[in-house]
Structures are given as structure tokens and as C-alpha cells.
């Protein structure tokens, strides 16, 4: 890019009018094309982002195209979407320039806004599928004297979670290009038929075409721009039915459907349950995962202590490695959909939440240093760290989080020394 040139000067267009051309093609040809190219970037264990880059097609572009294929659809057309038109549509989707990016550029905030929006679109499908399935298996089968997630899950979903995770794993495997290259089509079809025989599970992750459009409309109205960056309905329902046909345009989204999306379904409009899951389940998971690290020399769940007559609790998990110790706090928050709409007020709200979490850990570290509670031994301040662990990251600017955290601390204490500021910046992280 030449010096002085705006980012938008390098992009093709700032209109979504081209999407109306999707009405010319049959729904079947559009969604099967999405499925074909989705499968090409799927290995048996993950969505291969390196391959996606080489193929010049990103998962979020396929997801956007499949969503708009349903929105822009006519039942009386017969023309099929060909490969060249598919490629052109993907390029147009990729090169769309949102006016929110122009506003961010004017404010000198383009890098952080672009990274945030891009990450929210791309991060959910990245990574190995087995660790993710393991994590949510732990969540949905967790039982202690405070919560029985097995029973809760069956009561809300009608099936046990093991059936869902097995179904998701098999779907992912069967639709990956690696599997399709190794197993003959007939044999693979036999396997898929057996997997789809679990009608109760299939129903949980399937949405009818018109209902899909209704849900998208409820989320974003008729605003095509918000739909462009917004969370797609197929993250919850990757299977789309139309009359006697069933489509899965992005097969890899079956993993998202039975993990983070399923947790959101279980806790929908039930903040009490989500708080309990955060307190009992996710804290326990964090403790169990950290305790299995071979480098950990000491670990403790949260410790109750008092300051004067007031009862306090430490961070969720405290773990040491030699002479270093880390305070971990788990946060089961979910990024607001408004963040994807470039809503500065909502972005600032999430920054404030993260900043409060940072200061909460800072106070715990200070309380330890002041002698309000003890660990297995004495640790020097420079060897004490804080980690805010978020289940779903809003990917807001960490720089703004730290600035806000220092601002909050200054309101509490009147002044914040450069030493304290530097300590917070260098020793407390959000991951």
C-alpha cells in the first residue's frame, strides 16, 4: 500500500448489492458448493487455516455466502451456481469495505477494530476439535453437590451429551476431505447414514430454511451489513432443511453447535444457571487442567479469608511453579452481538468488564502481599502474576483494557504510581 493511501482505496467495493445475484441460482447448488469448499479445508482434526489460505477461501466467507444464499433465494429458478461464479462471490464478500472501518481509520483505531472484528469471525472455528470436545464434555457431564449438569442437560435438550458429541465428531470426520480421500464413497455413505439415524440429535442441530431466515431477521432485522459481520445462525444449527432436503453448508460448524453454542442454549435467559456453571463447573475445570501441568509445584482452589469482619475469596485457582505463582480467575462471559456491529458503546462496555477483572486480580495480589491470607510459602511481588481466563473472548483491545483498568484504580485510590501501572501491564493478562 502506498504511503498516504487509505486502506479502503485498496478494496474493490463498499456495497452489498451484488448479493441479490444469488437469487438466480438454486438453493441446492449454492449450499452444496459451500459444503464442497468447506470440506476441502477440513482435516480429520481441525479446520486447516493454512490450507484455507492457500485455497484462497476462508471459513467465514463460506459462512457468509451460505447465509446470504438462504436470504436471497427463489424457489422457481433452475440455474446452478458454477465454480467461477462461486469464486467471484467469495471475492466480493472478502473485499467488502464496511463504513465502520472507515470511521475507525479516521479515529486512528483501524488496527484494533479490524483485528477484533476479524478475530470474532475467525477464532471460533480455529483449533483442534478434540480438546474443545473434551472441554465441553467436562462441562456438560459435571456433577457435584451443587450442580448436576448431566440431569440439567437431559432436561433441557432431551438427550444426554455423549450422543451429541459422538454425532458431532463423526459428522466432522465424514465431511473432511482427508476422510473422503481415504474411504470409498459407498462405504462413507453407509457410515453417514448410521450417524444420521440418531434423529433426536439431528433434530437438535437442524433448522428449517424459513425459520433460519426468521431467526436471522430477529437478530439483525433486514440490515444486510449487520448480517455480514454478525453471528450466523448455522453456528447453532449447522443443518438446514428445505422440504425433503437436508444441507450442511459448513460441516465444521457442528463442533461449535455442540460446544459454545450449546452452552448458550442451555443457559439462555437463565443467568443464575450460567453463574452457577461458572462458579462450580468452569472453576473446577480450570483447577483440574492446571493441576495436570507437570511444572506445577503447588496448587490451591480459592481460599476463604477475612479482612476485618468481611469474608473474602481469593482468585479461583492459585498455582505455583517454583518461585513463581499465578492467580487465575475464570470468566464465563459471552461477547455481545453488538460488538460485531461496531457499536462503540458496547465495545467500551466489554473493555470495562475486562478492566474490572484485571483490577479484581490486582486486589487479590495486594491482599496476599498485605498478609491477609497465606500460600504454601512466601512469594516476591515480581514473581506473582494474574491471569483472567475468559471462556469466549470479545477480543477487545488489550491496550484499552489496561488503560481503563488504571483509570478504575485511580478512581478508587486517587493516584496510581508508575510502578503500579507497569506492574499491572506486565504481570496481569487476559487470555
Identify the function of each model-found stretch.
Residues 34, 39-40, 46, 60-63, ...:
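Interfaces and regulatory segments of ATP-dependent nucleotide/adenylate/phosphodiester-chemistry enzymes
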Residues 2-57, 380-382, 389-431:
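Non-catalytic C-terminal interaction segments of nucleic acid-processing enzymes
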Residues 27-30, 101, 373:
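Residue-level signal for secondary-structure boundary elements
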Residues 261-431:
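Catalytic core segments in nucleotide and nucleic-acid processing enzymes
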Residues 2-18, 213-228, 308-326, 331-336:
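Long, acidic, intrinsically disordered low-complexity segments
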